[in-house]
Structure formats: structure tokens, C-alpha cells
Amino acid sequence: LTNRCNLRCDYCCVDSKIENKDHLDTDEVKKAIDNIVKINPRTLTITGGEPLLREDFFEILSYVKEKFKGEIILSTNATLIEYSKVDEIIKDLYAIEISLDGYDELSCSKVRGEGVFTKVINLVKYIKSKGFDNIGLSMVVGKNNENNIDKFNKLNQELGTAPIIRNFMNIGRGNENSSRYLNDELDIGYICKGDYTDKNNLTANMCKAGVNQMSIDSKGDVYPCPNLEYDDLKMFNILQFEESILETIFSRDMDVFDKFDNLKTVNIEKCKDCKVNVFCTTCPSKVYTLKNDEEMFNSNCKKMKSILEHIIW
């Protein structure tokens, strides 16, 4: 809904900040919603920036609930939710995802500022007291806080919420602050180690971004996923949506899908002779970042090759 945010997290992949401007007015957002309904996705996530910064947020939320009959998720930092508005928000909502980035006041405040942790935890307890239980709390993981994952999971267990662990992505404001999250030994591949400790978790499949999911930015431009909002990967603008676009997407008859195929490690020249390339870095957004950063590529390659060769052989 917006690229404005009242917080300024140093990892933000879309560089949201309070001084950003909203690009779509209320009528344009409603038109976008009408076109999303035509696409008929299973789930619609309302996000930002911080969506509650929009003065017309509740008008838009009401319109979404009226028009869209699938699962509606609100993604928010929860700092602007007033207790008096909770009933209105949770009515007909499928889930709320709240970014928290910590298991206590100190760990949270390092990213989100003082007082956010207590405010969010109290709000979560209040929402749950209303009988709404489908709440997820998210944490972006980097070298500074990887040891906090167990404590974060324990917090979620105590609250009865779902932990959402997100990998740090070296894009947006995160690109400016990558040294705080990455180093030679703990690069963007390190967090994947837990996924590769069992052969059964290995996969050679690329994700289905652009087909199973799409991301719409604050201008209405549509991309394969939130981490691939680059000009060369723009699919179309939601305000200009036509039914024929769906046929083009499902037939993969768009230039963006050719570029997508080039984000497979098996198609990268320096990866072609690697014996574990089909299992390495199957996330297109990670590959996109690695291709354009030689130092990060080499660091990730060394780390992942060591992990994968150990597991496979």
C-alpha cells in the first residue's frame, strides 16, 4: 500500500522511510484491488512500508474484505494499531504478520527502537484475548543475531504465535548495511545450513515466483516477488491489468521469465562445472544479488560448496 514507514530498520529491503510519498490514491488502490480480484489469488497480503500510515487504511481494508474472498493477511510493525481498532482489523482477517526482530526489549530495540517490543507484545496478547490466534512474529537473521533464533522461537511458543525467520537480503537499505549482517564466514548462505543438514531437505527446484506469487509495489508495478523488485524484472502494472496478461504469465511468454531462467545456478557460467550447482542457492533473488557482487559470490560459493559436498558425499 505504501513505501512509507514510521520505523527505519537497517535491513529494509525496500528502503521504506517516513518521508517517502504515497504513489497511488484511494481510487487507484481500489482499482488495483478490483484487478487483483480478477486474478483470483488464494491469498492477498496487505503490506508496506507500514500500511497503517495511510490515512485511508481502514477504508481500503474494508474494501478488500468486501471484494476479495480469499485469505487476507495484514503485514505490519503493529506500532500504530490502536486497541479501539482491533476488532475492526481482525474481522474477516486470516492472519496478522508482525515484524519484531527480537526476543526481548534489548534485542528488538537494536533494530526497531526503544519501546517497540513491549508495545507489540502487549498488543499481541490483547488481540489473542479477542479470540484471534493466527498471528506470526518475524525476525530477520544476520551475523549479529543468529544465536537469538532459539530464544525467539521460545518467545513465540510462550505467546502462542508462529515464528517467521527471514533471511537477510542484500537489497534496498540492506545493501547499505550489509556489513552488519554478513561477513566472510557468515554470509547469505550460512542460514541455509540448517536446511541442508538432511538429504531429504535438498531440492533442485527453483521457486515459482511470478506464477505462484507476485508482489505489487507502492506504484502498482508487479514483480515476481518482494525481493525481486528490479526494473528489469517488472512484469506489468496492476492498474493496466487485462485478462490476457494471465495467459501470458501462465505460458511464461514474458521476457521476465527468460531472465528468471538465467537466475538458475546451472545457467551461470562460473557455476556450470560445479558438481553441486543444482542444489545451491535455489532462491532467484539471492542469485540475482550474487551475480552482481563478486566478493559475496565467492564467499557464498565457498560456504555452500563445503556444506553440500559434506551432506551429499
Question: Where are the language model's segments positioned?
Answer:
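Short, small/polar residue-rich loop motifs at catalytic or cofactor-binding pockets
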Residues: C207-V211
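C-terminal accessory region of radical SAM enzymes
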Residues: K130-F132, N170-L202, N227-T281
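Radical SAM enzyme core and accessory elements
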Residues: L233, L263-W313
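Canonical Radical SAM [4Fe-4S] cluster-binding loop centered on the CxxxCxxC motif
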Residues: L1-D27
